[in-house]
């Protein structure tokens, strides 16, 4: 999914988070649940 969780001032066009990820304030994919090595993969 596209990184929608960032604020409007964040440029996240290139960031895609996996299904179990959310976007943090730095436009990085962060885990919502599950092991970190499985949930946060860029697509």
Curated annotation (Swiss-Prot):
InterPro entries: Metalthion_5
Superkingdom, natural source: Eukaryota
Gene name for this UniProt entry: MtnC
Comment field on protein domains: All cysteine residues are arranged in C-X-C groups. These are thought to be the metal-binding sites in other metallothioneins.
GO biological process: cellular detoxification; cellular detoxification of metal ion; response to metal ion
Full protein name: Metallothionein-3
Function of the protein: This protein binds cations of several transition elements. Thought to be involved in metal ion homeostasis.
Native source species: Drosophila melanogaster (Fruit fly)
The keyword Ribosomal protein appears for this protein: no
Single annotated GO MF: metal ion binding
Family membership: Belongs to the metallothionein superfamily. Type 5 family.
Keywords: Cadmium, Copper, Metal-binding, Zinc
């Amino acid at each position: 999914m596209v990184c929608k969780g960032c604020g409007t001032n964040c440029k996240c066009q290139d960031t895609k988070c996996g299904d179990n990820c959310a976007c943090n304030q730095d436009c990085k994919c962060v885990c919502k649940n599950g092991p970190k090595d499985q949930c946060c993969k860029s697509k």
